[in-house]
A protein has these predicted regions:
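Left-handed beta-helix
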Residues: 1-5, 194-204, 218-426
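Unchanged
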Residues: 1-272, 362-363, 398-417, 422
Length: 426
């Protein structure tokens, strides 16, 4: 059996997801009420039978380390692991990770202990469900040295991705990084014979975007990184075209890069629809996450429509529509949420802590009585007082940092541990 090592890249600063990444790495951002983004690629690896997994971290990684260490613990009869490799300074490497390729290069010393035949390299901040065995089978059958997972996109979305040109056999012959909207890229369209074999290909999706997921033959990867290049997508893959056999693997399923506040918000809210494109309710391929042993949510006299409510919530006489309600969320009487992504809380406050809140004049963790919130992201442990109005009007406002809240991509964000006094209007 070939030895396959999975590497999940989780070291980015996630600046476009700020302030959600103010105190945590992007793959540690809560998602879907109870998960972390990094749970997605780890689950795909485990379901595919690839259980030797390294997670490369660097920026604000404490929360990510804690989550992985408390979640992915294999028994002694399984020759598998999910191990964190934090950026470190050594005699050979005195700088931090300079990019995705540089992160892998600086960890070969650790990878060599597993003596892999192949590397599967994944990103820690995407939403998809992939059988990596099919990806690997395609890699072997095509006799490729490198394989790149690709997904069909429209011309309108092409400027956000690296776009690949392939021949009739799926070999990659050209790579164009984020082509401008006014540039003619008609020659990059999916070949007709390949498009005909793509089941469920939606109209208008005529171009192939790199998903940032790769398979490398072990020796090929080491040779490809025997230089100072720092990034797979911008440098390693484009400069290897013509020198190496690089094959495209056309992934037919749902895939979304959760790299901005807009995509994060919209992808979360899409989970509340009746038939979401990505479905967490999959018996054959569940998404794993940390077991918290929380009680069932307690819901009293509420109206809840097209929403997801995670474990351990206490919701009283509230009106909730098209929203995600994360773990341990407390919502008091008369509150209304419409289009809200609420990440929940890390703990329940005790009676003594609530009494101290009264003496300090701050709200309890959760959402206070009579508060109305629309189109917002509420990060963990936020304290929102009574009769607040957040996102109620539709007036256009400049984006930026306003102290206890942020405005990004038209979405209001209440950051982690924020305090919003009673009666606030945002």
């Amino acid at each position: 059996m070939p030895r396959i090592l999975c590497i999940i890249l989780s070291g980015g600063r996630g600046e476009r997801l700020y302030p959600l990444t103010k105190e945590r790495a992007k793959p540690a951002v809560p998602f879907g009420g109870k998960y972390r983004l990094v749970d997605i690629p780890i689950s795909s690896c485990i379901h595919s039978g690839y259980k030797q997994i390294y997670v490369l971290t660097q920026y604000a990684s404490s929360s990510l380390h804690n989550h992985i260490a408390n979640t992915y613990i294999f028994d002694s009869f399984t020759q598998g692991f999910v191990e964190i490799l934090a950026a470190e300074q050594t005699h050979e490497h005195s700088s931090w990770y300079m990019g995705t390729a540089d992160a892998v290069r600086k960890n070969f010393l650790h990878f060599h202990t597993q003596d892999p035949d192949y590397y599967i390299i994944l990103s820690g901040d995407q939403l998809y469900r992939m059988d990596l065995r099919e990806f690997f089978r395609n890699h072997l059958e095509s006799q490729a040295e490198v394989s790149v997972a690709v997904t069909p996109v429209t011309r309108e979305r092409a400027p956000h991705f690296g776009i690949l040109e392939v021949d009739g056999q799926g070999r990659i012959v050209q790579f164009v990084e984020k082509p401008p909207a006014d540039r003619d890229i008609s020659h990059l369209r999916i070949p007709a014979n390949l498009a005909a074999n793509l089941k469920g290909l939606k109209p208008g999706r005529e171009y192939l975007a790199s998903m940032g997921i790769y398979i490398f033959n072990a020796g090929i990867l080491e040779k490809a990184l025997d230089n100072d290049l720092t990034d797979f997508g911008k440098e390693i893959i484009p400069q290897s075209i013509g020198r190496l056999k690089i094959q495209a693997y056309l992934f037919p399923g749902f895939w979304e890069d959760i790299g901005t506040i807009k995509s994060f918000y919209e992808t979360n809210i899409s989970l509340t629809t009746i038939t979401p494109e990505f479905d967490f309710y999959n018996e054959d391929h569940p998404i794993y996450t940390r077991r918290r042993d929380l009680p069932a949510s307690k819901i009293n006299a509420c109206v809840i429509n097209q929403s997801l409510t995670a474990d351990g919530c206490i919701i009283t006489n509230a009106n909730i529509m098209n929203s995600i309600v994360g773990i341990r969320t407390i919502i008091e009487s008369g509150a209304t949420l419409d289009g809200v992504v609420c990440m929940g809380a890390d703990y329940y406050e005790t009676a003594e802590e609530k009494a101290r809140n009264r003496s300090l004049g701050i709200p309890d963790i959760g959402i206070g009585r009579g508060t109305l919130i629309r189109k917002a992201i509420i990060d963990k442990n936020a304290r929102i007082g009574e009769v607040c109005r957040i996102g109620v009007d539709s007036l256009a406002r400049p984006e930026g940092d306003f102290g206890h809240y942020y405005l990004r991509d038209g979405v209001i964000i209440i950051p982690k541990n924020a305090v919003v006094p009673s009666g606030s209007v945002i």
